Amino acid sequence: MAVDLLSAQEPVTFRDVAVFFSQDEWLHLDSAQRALYREVMLENYSSLVSLGIPFSMPKLIHQLQQGEDPCMVEREVPSDTRLGFKTWLETEALPHRQDIFIEETSQGMVKKESIKDGHWDINFEEAVEFESEIEEEQEKKPLRQMIDSHEKTISEDGNHTSLELGKSLFTNTALVTQQSVPIERIPNMYYTFGKDFKQNFDLMKCFQIYPGGKPHICNECGKSFKQNLHLIEHQRIHTGEKPYKCNECEKTFSHRSSLLSHQRIHTGEKPYKCNECEKAFSNSSTLIKHLRVHTGEKPYRCRECGKAFSQCSTLTVHQRIHTGEKLYKCGECEKAFNCRAKLHRHQRIHTGEKPYKCSECGKGYSQFTSLAEHQRFHTGEQLYTCLECGRTFTRIVTLIEHQRIHTGQKPYQCNECEKAFNQYSSFNEHRKIHTGEKLYTCEECGKAFGCKSNLYRHQRIHTGEKPYQCNQCGKAFSQYSFLTEHERIHTGEKLYKCMECGKAYSYRSNLCRHKKVHTKEKLYKWKEYGKPFICSSSLTQYQRFFKGDKAYEV
């Protein structure tokens, strides 16, 4: 198809790049299609403004910027035209156009069209023949494929611009006079082929205009945007402005799209469904993230360590490990965190909130992971096994800490006294010896402790609570460590081995006492007789026996 545009003297107007729908068709569009329409129209308008073309803001753009539905009037081409399709026009009159001569040579016929005094003068016999060709091709493949399959070129020669799209698109939808502006666009008349008008969104996206560059720059951070609307939305990050308010819960948002997504929480609407597992979501972005669970795709990679992530937000949080950045600070204790979720979990320490309850015993937890680990006590599930001694654990962190007994690893070292620990909790408690910090006080006896767990253990002395029970003999203990040591009686496990003679013990305290045999260290003496003893318990037993305590007589 060869096209010659003669006498193209008129500048581009917004009407040239606008698309209009009838009220009836607008109501049949879903939210995603309406959002696409708004995006394309606002971007086309912004692009024309960036070209420096002087014109006032159209009513349609004002409505779209305010988040309103565009007002449209449907008009039909008179029935005697026999074109068989509808045309949607703006309520204002059509602009005047110069003559347009169109040559159709693929089948040896010539078509001429002219626009005089603001009216379209069309050779209708050829138009009907051309429409039938379109319908035949539509039956073979969808409109999107039709557009993709045709070669599209834009060539410029002086003041004349030609656009070649092939025969699948009606000529008037592709060609409008312009003055030396190399941009793609849709004219003031937008045709729908048949009743499947939703496919026209593909056509609309195809003709979206991009004059090049990002002319709209943020004065705060220097970021640039193609559309002024996007710049305005971005600036709300700096100003904190949130103009969109939810009528249900009064929560506010900086973007209208965020408000629409949020409102689906109240309505329960989940229009986006995963074809793999049938799981549904309230917004498309969440569905896209979810699909990566099935595909295993991790498109976001850390430049520092090469670790990959399925979500950009997860990468952002991860990168703060390298930078040391901690944006989220606790208002109670000034402790800072690198992500908001960790701050929320931490704040439950101050509020005492425990939203996760065990259905078996009613015990509450501040974290879901803690509840999941606790529930394994009821089910008896032991997921993690030590390869050295075969011992099983309900938590992987407990297994890692346990394995340090075998390896002797002590990664946590005190900067004050250089003492090392194999558990962070033990290291954290030790540090408070140097600082003298004791935040947690027992209300019964006034004794203070450096950490909350020590206070809880201490309070069991007053309450007599023994929550840890042996599955073998039923004996109960106030501390989990006591239960662990007791279970070694049944298993015969002896973790603590003397490096001098190879003798093994079930308890660390027994190993420590044994080591004094090799060092000949005798710390405990009876003042009356001066007899030395290796451990205090031996001294106590000897004193009772010497004084005639019947409990220790053989």
Curated annotation (Swiss-Prot):
Glycyl lysine isopeptide (Lys-Gly) (interchain with G-Cter in SUMO2) crosslink - at what positions?
Answer: K111, K167, K198, K531
Report domain KRAB positions: 12-83
Annotated GO molecular function terms are: DNA-binding transcription factor activity, RNA polymerase II-specific; DNA-binding transcription repressor activity, RNA polymerase II-specific; RNA polymerase II cis-regulatory region sequence-specific DNA binding; zinc ion binding
Q: In terms of domain of life, where is this protein from?
A: Eukaryota
Which cellular component, as a GO term, is one annotated location?
A: nucleus
Q: Does the keyword Zinc apply?
A: yes
GO biological process per UniProt: angiogenesis; negative regulation of sprouting angiogenesis; regulation of transcription by RNA polymerase II
Pfam families, alphabetically?
Answer: KRAB, zf-C2H2, zf-H2C2_2
The subcellular localization recorded is: Nucleus; Nucleus membrane; Cytoplasm
InterPro entries attached to this UniProt entry:
KRAB, KRAB_dom_sf, Zinc_finger, Znf_C2H2_sf, Znf_C2H2_type
Q: Does the keyword Lipoprotein apply?
A: no
Which PROSITE patterns does the entry link to? KRAB (PS50805), ZINC_FINGER_C2H2_1 (PS00028), ZINC_FINGER_C2H2_2 (PS50157)
Q: Which PANTHER family match?
A: PR DOMAIN ZINC FINGER PROTEIN, ZINC FINGER PROTEIN 154-LIKE
Function according to Swiss-Prot or TrEMBL: Transcriptional repressor that inhibits endothelial angiogenic sprouting. Suppresses osteogenic effects of RUNX2 and may be involved in osteoblastic differentiation. Plays a role in postnatal myogenesis, may be involved in the regulation of satellite cells self-renewal.
Question: What is said about its interaction partners and assembly?
Answer: Interacts with RUNX2. Binds consensus element OSE2. Interacts with TRIM28.
Protein family per UniProt:
Belongs to the krueppel C2H2-type zinc-finger protein family.
Q: What is this protein called?
A: Zinc finger protein 354C
Protein species of origin: Homo sapiens
